[in-house]
């Protein structure tokens, strides 16, 4: 996969940084992680399956492979649980992930600049579900970065099954490892900001890698309460660790203004429902999901007593 990335990246402005990214990624893949043999064995088994062409048939990223052995494929893919982002369909096997990513995609795609021929970065890409959608939408190259190693192997598993591979890649890197060069036309940061101890640093790091007039799509948890500027959870939020700050819409707009982004627009605010986030048999033995994270007596509150999750999507330009 890294050799393919080199081949495609060198035909774009990412030529300036691709060798550095490959060296960093190689180092991560060579780390001593006891799960890697299991993950690599799963991918080895997946490679014995027939491949198919990739397209998007709502809600699924669909791989139209024929004569798939559903039993062995499902068994191999479940060696890579939990599957958070998706859903995917391979032949007639439906990989119903915890999140219905298509719902978020449909909320934002009509409003952003066309991705055709763009160099696109997907920060915190997970297994690459959205990164694939960016590539299908015509990106010259769509690069996801995801430091959690398992999700990189999930990406490779899906990639193994595709015979019309678009220019899409996921590397096991965090945003701070991307050189501060203005190379990306469009940058997505979705579900990342609230996990940052330093939101200003994150916004500035995003800006550093964007071309002049490049577009940022920022999706994050917010607080939608009158006269409340932000909430800093002590402990967990909706049973999530490392949630550092939930801003109001106006506070988030101010943060973007302070970072000197321009043309700031709020596209959408949506309360997360169990239609979009739910437990499935693809998330493993820990079958808790949104309904378990909310107060059973008041679904407008989390189990900790905070307002239930709402997510906002902003777009802006450098």
Swiss-Prot record:
Catalyzed chemical reaction(s): carboxy-S-adenosyl-L-methionine + 5-hydroxyuridine(34) in tRNA = 5-carboxymethoxyuridine(34) in tRNA + S-adenosyl-L-homocysteine + H(+)
Listed Gene3D superfamilies: Vaccinia Virus protein VP39 (3.40.50.150)
EC number from the UniProt entry: 2.5.1.-
SUPFAM superfamilies noted in UniProt: S-adenosyl-L-methionine-dependent methyltransferases
CDD domains noted in UniProt: AdoMet_MTases
One of the protein's GO biological processes: tRNA wobble uridine modification
Record key words, sorted: Transferase, tRNA processing
Binding residues for carboxy-S-adenosyl-L-methionine: 85, 99, 104, 124, 175-176, 190, 194, 311
InterPro entries recorded: CmoB, Mo5U34_MeTrfas-like, SAM-dependent_MTases_sf
Example of a GO MF term: transferase activity, transferring alkyl or aryl (other than methyl) groups
UniProt-listed Pfam families: Methyltransf_9
Function comment: Catalyzes carboxymethyl transfer from carboxy-S-adenosyl-L-methionine (Cx-SAM) to 5-hydroxyuridine (ho5U) to form 5-carboxymethoxyuridine (cmo5U) at position 34 in tRNAs.
UniProt record similarity statement: Belongs to the class I-like SAM-binding methyltransferase superfamily. CmoB family.
Subunit and partners: Homotetramer.
Entry protein name: tRNA U34 carboxymethyltransferase
């Amino acid at each position: 996969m890294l050799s393919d990335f080199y081949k495609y990246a060198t035909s774009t402005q990412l030529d300036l940084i691709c060798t550095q990214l490959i060296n960093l990624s190689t180092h991560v893949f060579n780390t001593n992680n006891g799960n890697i043999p299991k993950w690599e064995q799963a991918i080895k088994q997946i490679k014995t399956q027939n491949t198919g062409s990739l397209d998007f048939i709502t809600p699924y990223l669909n791989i139209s492979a024929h004569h798939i052995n559903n039993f062995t494929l499902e068994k191999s893919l479940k060696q890579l649980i939990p599957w958070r982002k998706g859903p995917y369909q391979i032949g007639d096997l439906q990989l119903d992930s915890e999140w219905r990513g298509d719902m978020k995609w449909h909320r934002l795609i009509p409003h952003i600049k066309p991705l055709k021929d763009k160099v696109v970065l997907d920060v915190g890409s997970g297994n690459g579900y959205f990164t694939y959608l960016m590539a299908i939408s015509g990106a010259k190259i769509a690069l996801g970065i995801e430091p959690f190693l398992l999700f990189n192997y999930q990406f490779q598993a899906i990639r193994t099954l595709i015979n019309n591979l678009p220019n899409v890649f996921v590397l096991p890197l965090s945003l701070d490892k991307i050189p501060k060069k203005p190379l990306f036309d469009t940058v997505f940061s979705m579900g990342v900001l609230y996990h940052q101890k330093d939101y200003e640093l994150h916004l500035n790091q995003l800006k550093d890698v964007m071309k002049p007039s490049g577009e940022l799509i920022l999706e994050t948890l917010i607080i939608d309460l009158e006269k409340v500027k932000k909430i800093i959870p002590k402990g967990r939020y909706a049973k999530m660790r490392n949630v550092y700050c939930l801003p109001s819409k106006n506070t988030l707009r101010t943060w973007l203004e302070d970072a000197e982004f321009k043309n700031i627009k709020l596209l959408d605010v949506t309360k997360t429902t169990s239609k979009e986030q739910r437990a499935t048999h693809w998330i493993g033995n820990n079958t808790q999901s949104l309904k378990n994270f909310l107060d059973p007596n008041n679904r407008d509150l989390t189990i900790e007593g905070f307002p239930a999750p709402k997510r906002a999507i902003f777009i802006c330009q450098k």
